[in-house]
């Protein structure tokens, strides 16, 4: 019988041939025409999980051997475009010779159509009509067991038997993103940490808190329990460094194979043969491992294969070159995760109704369709300037919005998504051969598309309410976020439809707001608030139909921000999203006129909400707006020598300080480590956008404007870490808000002279500064020059203060000339043009005095 013959051969191979790092699945053995059998090698090994349970932790020497075996196995899989995706002790076996081996690839992911794949694979995939993308990852079998939080009942919070896989999942996977080679390296790091220290780097008895800890918290101190006899201090240092590089939450910064193999922690006589893999990368992976095995009797590798009885197709490990970037798959790779059955990518246009989706949810077979993207934001909100927010009709009608920046920018800083496989059909009807027929067809297609999207969001709203795993919900929320952040013009029409329908049919917004209130999972709240912020930030017009939900959200955010005092990492992430989404709502409402705001939205004033943001950094003062006495007539009079006597028009533009709240924003600008820089950035951007749409809001910032402006200068001057993109964006937003304050209260620019000199101001326009920062300060300089000219009387009599200012400005302009004009090839063209204008002004100096500027 074929089965018996195959059984004998496998048993003989196991007993007599080389020992593998990977137990392979043998080829299909055909018993008869209708039945296929999956034959595996008989295993006489010992479970590594049982070994750890008995011994708790490993010595350094044993850990080195363990690491070498597991790294060889993972490297072999990655070189063949396979992500193991479920590394944990129960999936590792130890044979009688002490060799550690991976036991199964049942949950692994095969990356198809990699650039290194042969033409046959490409041709096969091109013939697959269900695959519209040439770069795909396919889940080999079901991953439902991995996504369950608890081993027995996922909804039983009292059950502390947490699914073992959760401890080893990487932060990006727990956030709902796809697996990558880097995810396997993270899992290896957790495993190595557990083996050497005896405890997990992240631990909790509650599965939800465990997930939050992995995503947001720092790992525990890695303490070696059984160091070698010598150099235990050096070993500990190397181990600390290794763990810091493996357990890096950003997968783009996580250590890769070349650096991992040669890390000092693994440098000893037992692992010298591992380095041969790096030195001979021109050979195929199989050849490398065979050569490596010849240098050591403790390890060798063999090819692995698997077969599927459902498809009768085998997974073969091709002999191929090592991928160029083995640390992560192609960012354009799509992943299709299959549960129990192989389902093609779903398209709403291919279904008659959404019942198919509902059935998938009820049967727990929801197809998870997401993409591999650059995770470097958000993973927390990445400080990358997004495209300008689309102008809404209220914004376009504002005549007072002239500034150095032509438009506002989103408060929420996000990654920009370039491509995403849509679950929604995107029909572009551009052919107009027959006007009448085509118009009718276009209308019908548009109506069908709208109906599809409506059904799609009805399905999503229903799904969000279901009781399913956190990871599944996070996957769906991440898909929606990525969908709305698409920058590809190809999808602009579909995104526009999405936003219109989200606002017109408010079921999704209502359900999201409701989930924020009732959900006990902070990580889910973070994602939902983030999603709502993007919806509001990208919407040109919020429908009045969503009034109740938006107002509820506004009040919820206002109350949460006011009472927020928790500083752990997950709460900090929540606070960031609270502030950013709150800022997006305030910015949208600030674009509406007072009548629309009060009659349609029922909001008489935004002052309460703006003060909530200000109170994040409020310094208590005995004075308050309510206690401040009304200005007396004498207080409004000016002495004959004051500048106001010569320029009443200027003074009339300055609001009365006694009407302002007693606040100080100086703590925003200082480098106090207690202030989260991301929240600082969101806050400053909110203020900046409010000053664009409603310059009258300057009154909220004016009581200590002089101190505020000097603090802005100090912050921009002192922190010149140009490698930190977050710092750069803080500088840009700070200088922009700084300019708007000066523009609305020009006389405040005179205060810059008190604690400033030309070296400080030159620093503001230094070539190393971002060009937007330079432009803002050049505009401020122009205001400063203009004010000084306005204070020159008909007899060219200038008081001492203004004379000093003139001298300062002259010196500054001379510096400007030397700084910019002589280095015009090194500066931004816009900055050069602006600086050349100021150089022309320099020629109008006469006897250290200004000539009036018309």
From Swiss-Prot:
GO cellular component: membrane
Ranges where the record places region Disordered: 116-135, 289-331, 384-408, 425-446, 627-650
Gene3D superfamilies for the chain: Transferase(Phosphotransferase) domain 1
Biased composition (Low complexity): 292-322, 633-650
Compartment(s) of residence: Membrane
Stated family: Belongs to the protein kinase superfamily. Ser/Thr protein kinase family.
Organism: Dictyostelium discoideum
Record protein name field: Probable inactive serine/threonine-protein kinase DDB_G0274821
Any matching Pfam family: Pkinase
Organism domain of life: Eukaryota
InterPro entries, alphabetized: Kinase-like_dom_sf, Prot_kinase_dom, Ser/Thr_kinase_AS, ULK4
Domain writeup: The protein kinase domain is predicted to be catalytically inactive.
Residues annotated as domain Protein kinase: 1-266
Membrane topology (UniProt): Single-pass membrane protein
Glycosylation sites: 32, 106, 163, 279, 283, 290, 325, 347, 365, 414, 520, 541, 620, 757
Transmembrane feature ranges: 770-792
Keyword Glycosyltransferase listed: no
Keywords on record: Glycoprotein, Membrane, Transmembrane, Transmembrane helix
GO MF terms, alphabetically ordered: ATP binding; protein kinase activity
């Amino acid at each position: 019988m074929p089965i018996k013959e195959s059984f004998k051969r496998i048993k003989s191979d196991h007993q007599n041939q080389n020992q593998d790092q990977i137990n392979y699945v043998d080829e299909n053995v055909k018993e008869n025409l209708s039945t296929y059998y999956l034959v595996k090698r008989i295993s006489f090994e010992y479970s590594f999980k049982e070994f750890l349970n008995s011994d708790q932790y490993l010595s350094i020497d044993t850990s080195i051997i363990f690491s070498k075996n597991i790294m060889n196995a993972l490297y072999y899989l990655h070189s063949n475009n396979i992500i193991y995706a479920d590394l944990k002790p129960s999936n590792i076996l130890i044979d009688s010779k002490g060799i550690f081996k991976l036991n199964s690839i049942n949950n692994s992911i095969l990356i198809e159509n990699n650039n290194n794949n042969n033409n046959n694979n490409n041709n096969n995939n091109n013939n697959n009509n269900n695959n519209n993308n040439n770069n795909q990852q396919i889940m080999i079998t079901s991953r439902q067991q991995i996504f369950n939080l608890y081993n027995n009942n996922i909804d039983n919070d009292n059950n502390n038997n947490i699914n073992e896989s959760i401890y080893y999942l990487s932060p990006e996977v727990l956030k709902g993103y796809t697996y990558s080679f880097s995810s396997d390296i993270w899992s290896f790091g957790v495993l190595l940490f557990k083996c050497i220290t005896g405890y997990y780097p992240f631990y909790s008895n509650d599965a939800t808190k465990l997930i939050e800890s992995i995503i947001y918290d720092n790992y525990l101190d890695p303490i070696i329990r059984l160091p070698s006899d010598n150099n235990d201090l050096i070993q500990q240092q190397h181990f600390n460094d290794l763990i810091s590089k493996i357990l890096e939450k950003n997968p783009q910064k996580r250590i890769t194979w070349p650096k991992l193999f040669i890390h000092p922690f693994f440098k000893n006589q037992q692992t010298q043969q591992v380095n041969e893999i790096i030195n001979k990368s021109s050979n195929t992976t199989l050849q490398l491992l065979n050569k490596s095995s010849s240098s050591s009797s403790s390890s060798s590798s063999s090819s692995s294969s698997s077969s599927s009885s459902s498809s009768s197709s085998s997974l073969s490990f091709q002999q191929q070159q090592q991928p160029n970037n083995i640390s992560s798959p192609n960012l354009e790779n799509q992943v299709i995760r299959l549960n129990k059955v192989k389902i093609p990518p779903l398209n709403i246009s291919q279904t008659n109704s959404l019942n198919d989706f509902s059935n998938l949810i009820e049967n727990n077979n929801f197809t998870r369709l997401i993409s591999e993207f650059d995770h470097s934001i958000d993973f927390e909100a990445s400080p990358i300037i997004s495209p300008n927010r689309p102008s809404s009709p209220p914004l376009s009608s504002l005549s007072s919005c002239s500034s150095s920046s032509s438009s506002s920018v989103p408060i929420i800083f996000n990654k920009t998504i370039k491509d995403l496989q849509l679950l929604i059909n995107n029909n572009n009807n551009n052919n107009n051969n027959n006007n009448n027929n085509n118009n009718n067809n276009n209308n019908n297609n548009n109506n069908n598309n709208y109906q599809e999207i409506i059904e799609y969001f009805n399905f999503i709203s229903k799904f969000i309410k279901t009781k399913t795993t956190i990871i599944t919900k996070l996957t769906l929320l991440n898909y929606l976020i990525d969908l709305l952040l698409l920058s590809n013009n190809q999808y602009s029409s579909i995104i526009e439809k999405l936003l219109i329908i989200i606002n017109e049919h408010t079921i999704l917004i209502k359900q999201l707001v409701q989930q924020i209130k009732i959900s006990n999972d902070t990580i889910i709240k973070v994602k939902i608030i983030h999603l709502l912020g993007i919806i509001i930030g990208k919407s040109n017009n919020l429908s009045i139909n969503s009034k109740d939900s938006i107002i509820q959200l506004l009040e919820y955010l206002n109350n949460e921000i006011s009472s927020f005092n928790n500083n752990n990492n997950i709460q900090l992430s929540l606070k960031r999203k609270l502030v950013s989404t709150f800022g997006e709502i305030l910015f949208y409402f600030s674009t509406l006129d007072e009548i629309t705001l009060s009659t349609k939205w029922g909001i008489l004033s935004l002052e309460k909400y703006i003060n909530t943001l200000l109170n994040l950094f409020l310094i208590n003062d005995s004075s308050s707006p309510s206690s401040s006495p009304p200005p007396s007539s004498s207080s409004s009079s000016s002495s004959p020598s004051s500048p106001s006597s010569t320029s009443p028009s200027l003074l009339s533009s300055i609001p009365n300080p006694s009407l302002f709240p007693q606040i100080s924003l100086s703590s925003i600008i200082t480098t106090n480590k207690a202030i989260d820089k991301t929240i600082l950035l969101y806050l400053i951007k909110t203020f900046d956008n409010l000053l664009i749409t409603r310059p009258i809001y300057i009154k909220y910032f004016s009581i200590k404007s002089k101190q505020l402006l000097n603090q802005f200068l100090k912050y921009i001057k002192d922190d010149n870490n140009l490698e930190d993109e977050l710092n750069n964006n803080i500088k840009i937003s700070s200088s922009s808000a700084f300019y708007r304050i000066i523009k609305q209260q020009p006389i405040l620019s005179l205060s810059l002279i008190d604690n400033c000199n030309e070296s400080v101001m030159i620093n503001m326009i230094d070539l190393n500064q971002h060009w937007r920062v330079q432009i803002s300060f050049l505009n401020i300089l122009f205001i400063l020059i203009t004010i000084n000219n306005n204070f020159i009387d008909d007899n060219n009599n200038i008081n001492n203060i203004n004379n000093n200012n003139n001298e300062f400005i002259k010196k500054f302009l001379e510096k400007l000339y030397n700084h910019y004009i002589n280095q015009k090839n090194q500066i931004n063209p816009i900055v050069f043009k602006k600086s050349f204008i100021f150089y022309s002004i320099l020629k109008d100096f006469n006897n250290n005095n200004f000539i009036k500027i018309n």
